[in-house]
Amino acid sequence: MTERQKTYFDLSIGGKPAGRVVFEVYSDVTPKTAENFVRLCAGDAGECRTKPGVPLCYQGSLFHRVIKGFMCQFGDFTNGDGTGGESIYGEKFEDENFARKHDRPFLLSMANAGPNTNGSQCFITCAPTPHLDGKHVVFGEVIQGKRVVRAIERQETAADRPLADVRIDACGILPASYEVPADAEATPADEYGDDYEETLADDAKVDLADPRSVIRAVEAVKAIGTAQLQAARFDVAVQKYAKAAGFLQEYFPDDLPDADVAALEQLKVAVHLNLALAALKAGNHQRVLSAASEVLHGAADDKAKAKALYRRGLAYHHLKDPEMALTDLELAATYQPGDAGIAQAIVNARALKQKLREQQKKALSKMFS
């Protein structure tokens, strides 16, 4: 059996080292396509025919196209914008086969401009992409550095191009004896004690088949958010609550027992209430609106609805929208009659409404005086 070769990219994002990604290519399934990639990593295939003087090598080139939830594309070392690149066999070569499917994230596949137009451009899948089956040749996978791929996937983009350069600083072939370290994909805890990946599916600690494992992950990150809220690190609290909320959004299989659905729904309400509170204290009023709205669209009881409406009403007040603030606050009062905080917020919103009305009158009188 043909031994599968391993190659690596050492990457930087915005000029800062981002880590190493290690690939295993399917030399036994797609030998010609795999050999093209390996030689372009090694940089030992000479110069481009289309651009003499430019090495046939990925080193120094960029990830020029990134679409979250889809793929990260690279390999245009001649033009840098997706219009160039070249294979070791010439400008283009044929589709070898479509034996492997795009059935999971972290697969390595050839980019092309149609049938039999493979060059040097490739992409890493960020999710299953079955619509590409039969059109693009899957020839390898990421076996180390999945967190680095996710970091690339999360980059802010304009027209799908990362705003910060994602560069292949170095690349090459690893020895046949190379083995991925046992702890290579372990998530290091951050300074707040959070050792969970940004995506549940990427975290080896979480068993997606067990709702209790998911709940433990959400509660752990939520607890970190609460600790940061109590320490008045409001921006960090927002980040952690948002991460916990993202876990819940990511996970909700159709076949869960009713008891597990109820537990997850209640946890979702609690996380979004806390997110709204932390965002309010951080001055992130748009985030308050979205988090509070999630509570109101969920399985919230009257007490939770009152809190969500109160926090959303305060956010509208800060956004100088007293009409919306009063709508929320007056409805909150029906769920929590006699609450002094809600009552005072209503008084404040009415005062803001009057103040803005008087300012408008003055502005109009100046226009017509």
From Swiss-Prot:
Keyword Cytoplasm: yes
The keyword ATP-binding appears for this protein: no
First-level EC class: isomerase
Chain positions of TPR repeats: 218-251, 269-302, 306-339
Annotated SUPFAM superfamilies: Cyclophilin-like, TPR-like
CDD domains listed in its UniProt record: cyclophilin_ABH_like (cd01926)
UniProt catalytic activity: [protein]-peptidylproline (omega=180) = [protein]-peptidylproline (omega=0)
Enzyme nomenclature, EC number: 5.2.1.8
Localization per record: Cytoplasm
Any one Gene Ontology molecular-function term assigned to this protein's record: peptidyl-prolyl cis-trans isomerase activity
PPIase cyclophilin-type domain mapped to chain residues: 8-173
Cellular component, GO, one term: intracellular membrane-bounded organelle
Pfam family, one: Pro_isomerase
Similarity comment: family membership: Belongs to the cyclophilin-type PPIase family. PPIase D subfamily.
Function comment: PPIases accelerate the folding of proteins. It catalyzes the cis-trans isomerization of proline imidic peptide bonds in oligopeptides.
Name assigned to this protein: Peptidyl-prolyl cis-trans isomerase D
Organism expressing this protein natively: Eremothecium gossypii (strain ATCC 10895 / CBS 109.51 / FGSC 9923 / NRRL Y-1056) (Yeast)
Encoding gene, per UniProt annotation: CPR6
